[in-house]
Amino acid sequence: MIRTVLAAMALCLAVASPLRAQAAFDETTERAAIFGVVSDMQAAWNRGDYRGYMQGFKNPDVVFVSGGKIKNGWQGALDDYIRNYGPTPESRGTLTFYDMTVEFLAPDAAQLIGHYRLDRPERPMEGINTRLFRKIDGRWVIALNHVSAYEVAPTQQAR
């Protein structure tokens, strides 16, 4: 009899725990947290802090998809940003993320789709990001980042 009661209590706790966790999920708060990550990344990029920019990505095993290639790894991405965008504001440009939407796939997973613009004297860029965010240890990070980029035509640069 005691075993039956203990088994029933264990079953109730097992069922109730996920329900309690889901009830605590506040979509508005979590969406704001994700937008906060992106805002922090934008600010870090614009002050030349590539390492700060990379804090928005899962370390070490983030996946990047861009230019028809799949690249794995946080450190490699950081090295690419430093090499490809350089140390000066002119080479780095000014980054702006905009028109972003977030869809929650689970309490610990969300998809963000948005646009970005990189204003710089040579080769200004614009594109679309599709990002899979995961909540790990209470913090939202990008686990998968897909970019479709294109150079901005000279007539489109003035926004």
Residues of each region from the PLM?
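Short beta-strand edge/turn micro-motifs at domain boundaries
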Residues: 126-153
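A solvent-exposed, acidic/Ser-Thr-rich amphipathic alpha-helical stretch
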Residues: 32-37, 50-108, 117, 123-124
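A short, structured loop/turn motif at beta-sheet edges
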Residues: 102-110, 133-139
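Short, low-complexity N-terminal intrinsically disordered segments enriched in polar/charged residues
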Residues: 19-56, 154-159
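Positively charged n-region of N-terminal signal peptides that target proteins for export
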Residues: 1-4
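Bacterial N-terminal signal peptides
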Residues: 6-16
